[in-house]
């Protein structure tokens, strides 16, 4: 192989070029590649963190929804229970009012029956006295015979 000056000149130019590239071009290029790799890694980490936060947020939302459903069901159950209690209370009040009205009507009827009996007793006593008067053809004194008349009323 023939080694001539051209080859040595090419070698010198190659080493000078290699030194310039290694000194001035390679470090910024490596730095840019490292920065880009770091940005990509940071982006992937941020994406993973965002994905984890999204899953956590979804879990919190699901939990909040479950709590809201439970609370809503509890409120509905409480409202139904209150409505049932109110209906029972109204029913009991109505029954008590009906019983009171029935008792009052029975008492009034009893009073009317008692008054009617008293009135009938008085009328029967008067009729008995008049009948006895006519039978005896003389007047019976009501004051003198009040015991007899009271006994007659009691028997009727």
UniProtKB/Swiss-Prot annotation:
Main location: membrane
Transmembrane segments: 7-27
One Pfam family named in its UniProt record: ATP-synt_B
Cross-referenced InterPro entries: ATP_synth_B-like_membr_sf (IPR028987), ATP_synth_b/b'su_bac/chlpt (IPR002146), ATP_synth_F0_bsu_bac (IPR005864), ATP_synthase_B_chain (IPR050059)
GO MF terms held by the record: proton-transporting ATP synthase activity, rotational mechanism; proton-transporting ATPase activity, rotational mechanism
Lineage top rank: taxon: Bacteria
Subcellular location: Cell inner membrane
UniProt-listed SUPFAM superfamilies: F1F0 ATP synthase subunit B, membrane domain
Family named by the database record: Belongs to the ATPase B chain family.
Self-association and partners: F-type ATPases have 2 components, F(1) - the catalytic core - and F(0) - the membrane proton channel. F(1) has five subunits: alpha(3), beta(3), gamma(1), delta(1), epsilon(1). F(0) has three main subunits: a(1), b(2) and c(10-14). The alpha and beta chains form an alternating ring which encloses part of the gamma chain. F(1) is attached to F(0) by a central stalk formed by the gamma and epsilon chains, while a peripheral stalk is formed by the delta and b chains.
Function comment: F(1)F(0) ATP synthase produces ATP from ADP in the presence of a proton or sodium gradient. F-type ATPases consist of two structural domains, F(1) containing the extramembraneous catalytic core and F(0) containing the membrane proton channel, linked together by a central stalk and a peripheral stalk. During catalysis, ATP synthesis in the catalytic domain of F(1) is coupled via a rotary mechanism of the central stalk subunits to proton translocation.
HAMAP family linked: ATP_synth_b_bprime (MF_01398)
Protein name: ATP synthase subunit b
Lineage, opening ranks: Bacteria, Pseudomonadati, Pseudomonadota, Betaproteobacteria, Burkholderiales
């Amino acid at each position: 192989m023939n080694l001539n000056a051209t080859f040595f000149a090419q070698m010198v130019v190659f080493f000078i070029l290699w030194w310039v590239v290694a000194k001035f071009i390679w470090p910024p290029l490596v730095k840019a590649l490292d920065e880009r790799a770091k940005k990509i890694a940071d982006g992937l980490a941020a994406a993973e963190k965002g994905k984890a936060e999204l899953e956590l947020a979804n879990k919190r939302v699901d939990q909040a929804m479950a709590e809201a459903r439970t609370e809503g069901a509890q409120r509905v159950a409480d409202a139904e229970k209150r409505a049932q209690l109110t209906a029972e209370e109204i029913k009991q009040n109505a029954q008590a009012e009906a019983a009171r009205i029935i008792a009052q009507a029975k008492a009034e009827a009893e009073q009317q029956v008692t008054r009617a009996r008293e009135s009938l007793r008085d009328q029967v006593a008067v009729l008995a006295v008049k009948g006895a008067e006519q039978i005896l053809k003389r007047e019976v004194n009501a004051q003198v015979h009040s015991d007899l008349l009271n006994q007659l009323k009691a028997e009727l």
